[in-house]
């Protein structure tokens, strides 16, 4: 079984600092600017700025958005035991049915409610809530783990916005 927190905490995760991350990404961006034909960097930076480039326009008031894999989305998969899973990257405990009986809607909804309630509690006033990639397995995190990941999500949100602006100024956005 894959750990529900893998790979996030398998080796330990520390808080990152904005200046260090921004500097590292800027160095990579400078390299990509010199070598625009390097496909790996092109794909990497397109992923970094994808939200900013194609961001959905939603009301900032009201419910807390859930920008993550949810049961009954396009990431559903079937494992070797014919169980229906939410995402191939997370724990076996997130199986929501099987091929013979279909989706267990009570279990799927229970997972979503638990995740949503935790996000409402933790994320209601977060400036990065609409850009957050916090995984569904976040319902298993301790408060300390949430604090670390939330801090890091906010740092990367700022870095990716910086990259979007920097790439736009350099004429690198297609």
Where are these regions (language model features)?
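Flexible mid-to-C-terminal extensions adjoining Fe-S/redox cofactors in radical SAM and related proteins
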Residues: 83, 89-174
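Radical SAM enzyme [4Fe-4S]-AdoMet core and its adjacent flexible, acidic
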Residues: 1-85, 90-95
């Amino acid at each position: 079984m894959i750990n529900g927190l893998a790979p996030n905490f398998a080796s330990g995760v520390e808080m990152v600092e904005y200046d260090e991350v921004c500097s590292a990404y800027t160095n990579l961006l400078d390299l990509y600017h010199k070598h625009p034909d390097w496909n790996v960097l092109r794909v990497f930076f397109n992923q970094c700025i994808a939200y900013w480039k194609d961001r959905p326009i939603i009301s900032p008031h009201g419910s807390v958005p859930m920008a993550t894999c949810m049961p009954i989305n396009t990431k559903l998969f079937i494992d070797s035991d014919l169980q229906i899973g939410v995402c191939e990257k997370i724990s076996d405990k997130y199986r929501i049915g099987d091929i013979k009986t279909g989706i267990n809607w009570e279990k799927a909804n229970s997972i979503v409610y638990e995740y949503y309630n935790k996000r409402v509690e933790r994320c209601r006033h977060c400036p990065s809530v609409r850009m957050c990639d916090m995984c569904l397995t976040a319902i298993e995190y301790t408060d300390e783990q949430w604090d670390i990941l939330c801090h890091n999500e906010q740092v990367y949100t700022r870095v990716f916005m910086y990259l979007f602006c920097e790439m736009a100024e350099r004429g690198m956005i297609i």
